[in-house]
Amino acid sequence: MAAESSLRVATPTLCNLNGSQRRPTTTTLSPLRFMGFRPRPSSHSLTSSSLSHFFGSTRIHSNSSSSYSSISRQHAPRRNFSVFAMSADDAKRSVPLKDYRNIGIMAHIDAGKTTTTERILYYTGRNYKIGEVHEGTATMDWMEQEQERGITITSAATTTFWNKHRINIIDTPGHVDFTLEVERALRVLDGAICLFDSVAGVEPQSETVWRQADKYGVPRICFVNKMDRLGANFYRTRDMIVTNLGAKPLVIQLPIGSEDNFKGVIDLVRNKAIVWSGEELGAKFDIVDIPEDLQEQAQDYRAQMIENIVEFDDQAMENYLEGIEPDEETIKKLIRKGTISASFVPVMCGSAFKNKGVQPLLDAVVDYLPSPLDLPAMKGSDPENPEATIERLASDDEPFAGLAFKIMSDPFVGSLTFVRVYAGKLGAGSYVLNANKGKKERIGRLLEMHANSRDDVKVALAGDIIALAGLKDTITGETLCDPDNPIVLERMDFPDPVIKVAIEPKTKADVDKMATGLIKLAQEDPSFHFSRDEEINQTVIEGMGELHLEIIVDRLKREFKVEANVGAPQVNYRESISKISEVKYVHKKQSGGQGQFADITVRFEPMDPGSGYEFKSEIKGGAVPREYIPGVMKGLEECMSNGVLAGFPVVDVRAVLTDGSYHDVDSSVLAFQLAARGAFREGIRKAGPRMLEPIMKVEVVTPEEHLGDVIGDLNSRRGQINSFGDKPGGLKVVDSLVPLAEMFQYVSTLRGMTKGRASYTMQLAMFDVVPQHIQNQLATKEQEVAA
């Protein structure tokens, strides 16, 4: 946690680290690096001897798994297996890299991600039976909290095989509180399946994960799930993909029936119908002619599909204009080309719970999503020269390079570090370089994960997603590489907490255990922070929402046997400025012996929302010697965590060092650091300081008879109603923006107003200015606490 627990300054030089070519390199500063609360001690500094002081003492590869395209009447045999792609010969592959697919499954909560994954594992032979989320038996939801609540909390990885292809799958959460799990999964994946509920269509968290996939340039296919549900509408969902996501859907399947009459799909690529009879848990299906009443519709959609894809091949375009349709293989090749280039997203449909449509989805993963070889070479920077770009091809013959994207505590193995191998080979017992820290680490064991179970492997090759045991200093987002060929890959941005609560153990005997638990949980989850507030003598935990912190407290109890008292939730406010100010500050101290002298002029400028903090030097002619500028940077950086109004972090500010002077004897880095602190206090006060609060996008789905009550309640919470919509069943959708401070315990109020018939989703939309009267209350409260 050390690197994630400390504040970091991004200078123009540091901003130019190149990452994957899929993601455009940007020189804008990440606001997330400067939005932590009070300075948090490094978790690595909390040794067992210092814990009490910190917390205070007052309180198989199966070849028979085949594509549906091979025969007309299919029954895909399943068998449990334990043979994986890693052969005994370390230097050889059993699956070529071109046949690798590293994919994630992402969607809004309850769209059916884990249910779909369970069917994939069953039909590919990875599991011998189907696990169900509602029964708490889903393989990928292995945590007790996941099984009890029926939701995915942590991303889980597994490996399976289909049609002689190796598919590494990461199943991700859908709840907004656990969006970090989606972020770090997408950072290391090559493709994704985006699921949509055919009744609800594109939901708020669907939009969030779609933007995350856009951010990392991840090619994806869409699967409109739950076609068997009352109110299912494939075509409305297709339209919402256009209007809500701004994407270009390419329909390659049509549903045959819907709701209780959903029987199968029309495959527009083959121009055939695929029908499931319900036998053998969906393993049996028939490939038949398209029903007569759907032939005209199928012809129209097939023509639209072909018109869109022939644009990617001149010869195919010429033939099509001459009346010659491309054959099936050419159609697949062109769909694959357009998918990988993100020109469109193929759209399919089915019902995972009813075991319909999953095998064609697996074929689409193989046919349309990229292998590591289909993507540009991974780019990184030279640790010794951050402006120098280094490339790593996806090849076993390249020097090893991998990215740590997840830390997990295993009760039997200890700490596990999940790594995506981009290039080269890695063997158990070998040494790797942590390029971010410049430290060598020894690999204890290499483990291939299947949810929370594991299998030892001898070697990891390019394209693999592997768990490493034995690493002590590596954290999420850091690069592991060949010690003789160092490279730093682009890190991930971690969302900053928006909510905090005070926590303390119920007994003094649990102080050390709670400290140990919090450290381990923070190592696993970079969006979870904790700190000791000495002013109020409390430990404060911070997270992405009430559910997030509720799970943290529950894990403390279950995994670390710590009973804790938890305070009321509090909002993580920010501070910023509204105008430019420039201040000259002289730090002078003479008390015998060498004195202290530093003279600086700093200009503070407001930046666009979400810009974070930026430092810039405009010193010319050596007015402030180069060796003293880091002192100014450090002094300003330290102050950014503690604003002048109520002690909240300062964001969206650029500090420009414009002038200054020094003394040959009395000046030092420390003197300029102290001068920077003084300049910060004076400059920010003159720059129109203001407080910002998190504003949440709140979507409420309610029966029409309760619409007035819902709107009135949102208005009373300082809410801004943006729009209304309709959903099947006489339901109304209210889209609004509401301050997070007004949303605590909203679920109880909503249930009471609507007799339990309404539901809502909430996610962070932006930070906005706090009304003056509330700002005054917060400032007064902070002053009372400080006193």
Curated annotation (Swiss-Prot):
Residues 98-373 form the tr-type G domain. GO terms for biological process: ribosome disassembly. The keyword Metal-binding does not apply. Belongs to the TRAFAC class translation factor GTPase superfamily. Classic translation factor GTPase family. EF-G/EF-2 subfamily. GTP binds at residues 107-114, 171-175, 225-228. Residues 14-24 have a biased composition (Polar residues). This is Elongation factor G-1, chloroplastic. It comes from Glycine max. Residues 14-34 are annotated as: Disordered.
